[in-house]
Amino acid sequence: GRDGYIVDTKNCVYHCYPPCDGLCKKNQAKSGSCGFLYPSGLACWCVALPENVPIKDPNDDCHK
């Protein structure tokens, strides 16, 4: 796995809601915590997330 800011299918971070630890574990990560990612703001950071779960691509924007 790898560490990173978990994102949805549109490359948008989760703003610490739902709570990060539960969100990350639901996606088979070891744990999660609330971090800050510029310029997105509050964002869930996951530890040891499986390769198939998308993480933030810093070269791409959130496509809402």
UniProtKB/Swiss-Prot annotation:
Cellular component aspect of the GO annotation: extracellular region
Keywords on record: Disulfide bond, Ion channel impairing toxin, Neurotoxin, Secreted, Toxin, Voltage-gated sodium channel impairing toxin
GO molecular function: sodium channel inhibitor activity; toxin activity
LCN-type CS-alpha/beta domain mapped to chain residues: 2-63
GO biological process: defense response
Tissue: Expressed by the venom gland.
Top-level taxon of origin: Eukaryota
Locations listed in the record: Secreted
Pfam families in alphabetical order: Toxin_3
Positions in coiled-coil regions: none
Classification via InterPro entries: LCN-type_CS_alpha_beta_dom, Scorpion_toxin-like, Scorpion_toxin-like_sf, Scorpion_toxinL/defensin
Cystine pairings recorded for this chain: 12-62, 16-34, 20-44, 24-46
Family: Belongs to the long (4 C-C) scorpion toxin superfamily. Sodium channel inhibitor family. Alpha subfamily.
Function: Alpha toxins bind voltage-independently at site-3 of sodium channels (Nav) and inhibit the inactivation of the activated channels, thereby blocking neuronal transmission.
Domain comment, as recorded: Has the structural arrangement of an alpha-helix connected to antiparallel beta-sheets by disulfide bonds (CS-alpha/beta).
Protein name: Alpha-toxin Amm3
Organism field: Androctonus mauritanicus mauritanicus
